[in-house]
Amino acid sequence: MPTAFPPDSVGLVTPQIAHFSEPLALACGRALPAYDLIYETYGQLNASASNAVLICHALSGHHHAAGYHSVDDRKPGWWDSCIGPGKPIDTNRFFVVSLNNLGGCNGSTGPSSLNPDTGKPFGADFPVLTVEDWVHSQARLADRLGISQWAAVIGGSLGGMQALQWTITYPDRVRHCLAIASAPKLSAQNIAFNEVARQAILTDPEFHGGSFQEQGVIPKRGLMLARMVGHITYLSDDSMGEKFGRGLKSEKLNYDFHSVEFQVESYLRYQGEEFSGRFDANTYLLMTKALDYFDPAANCDDDLAKTFAHATAKFCVMSFTTDWRFSPARSRELVDALMAARKDVCYLEIDAPQGHDAFLIPIPRYLQAFSHYMNRITL
């Protein structure tokens, strides 16, 4: 447990909560009359508010992207390798905002929050959300913080989709967009993975139609299975082979169906167990649906280039060679569309064995390329 933080850490951070009482109209046709967004900031906003950077999180992410909440924390925020003094998102230059999206389960209003109309958790009655809904709520947070334009909006995976949506929905409010390990829409295979995960949750007897909190239980089995399926897709075959191979937990096989025999089985069960204790099942359903629904070109005759016609941002698109969840081909599809739309775009394909999760890992070439781009941003 650290008693002193590394010199390139943002150190101790305190989450803040912004309450919004103006109704937020949603794509599903419903509205939230009021809601909270929890967020953290790192660095200082300059006098002209020209150095603000928004971090958009992925499916299971949250607002705590960097630094520590306590001297007793064993781990820093989920993107600490990229945010801090001298790091790619340099807090000596940038004022960084990271939030937990609406519908989340880490402090922003979501399914586990109390519904003021009933006094009970929203549960399955919480409205289905889209990436564009998130961007609208994020824009309100920007207004609250006095930020009229982001120097950059940055995200990996689902976070990259939010960054892209910002350039479409609020084209004049983003100067740079960094979409990392992302895609312009999900493939049929990706939607299928999400559906398997959802069915694992929905068919868990402890789900209770989404009202499990009222029953004092959680659909642990369903969440475990959903996370196990998802986690397989975040890793590459090579990285799993190198880390686990066919290694056994003990010296011999047990010849049954219940024992944890292979090391990879143990790893997946641990990941599922840990996840089921900290994540809300209804939030998981919401996040996967937002992923499935993201398809901005659908509003432009499926013409991706036309989708970005009004974007004014400069784009940086990054992918990783062994990412099969959001493959380099999907990033190149995005780059081709941006070039067809005559946008300023650079593309980086990083050779990395870690698969989709590579965007979270401090790979030297990745950090170097990331830093190089961020250092070019004028404030």
Swiss-Prot record:
Places the protein is found: Cytoplasm
Enzyme Commission (EC) number: 2.3.1.46
GO MF terms held by the record: homoserine O-acetyltransferase activity; homoserine O-succinyltransferase activity
Enzyme class name: transferase
Superkingdom field: Bacteria
Pfam families associated with the record: Abhydrolase_1 (PF00561)
S-S bridge residues: none
Keywords from the UniProt entry: Acyltransferase, Amino-acid biosynthesis, Cytoplasm, Methionine biosynthesis, Transferase
Active site: 157, 323, 356
UniProt GO BP: homoserine metabolic process; methionine biosynthetic process
Gene Ontology CC annotations of this record: cytoplasm
Keyword hit for Hydrolase: no
Gene3D superfamilies from the UniProt entry: 1.10.1740.110, alpha/beta hydrolase
Binding positions for substrate per the UniProt entry: 227, 357
Record-annotated AB hydrolase-1 domain positions: 51-360
Residues annotated as site: Important for acyl-CoA specificity: 325
Main location: cytoplasm
Catalyses which reaction(s): L-homoserine + succinyl-CoA = O-succinyl-L-homoserine + CoA
Listed pathway(s): Amino-acid biosynthesis; L-methionine biosynthesis via de novo pathway; O-succinyl-L-homoserine from L-homoserine: step 1/1
Membership in a protein family: Belongs to the AB hydrolase superfamily. MetX family.
Family matches, as HAMAP family: MetX_acyltransf
Described function: Transfers a succinyl group from succinyl-CoA to L-homoserine, forming succinyl-L-homoserine.
Quaternary data: Homodimer.
Protein name from the UniProt record: Homoserine O-succinyltransferase
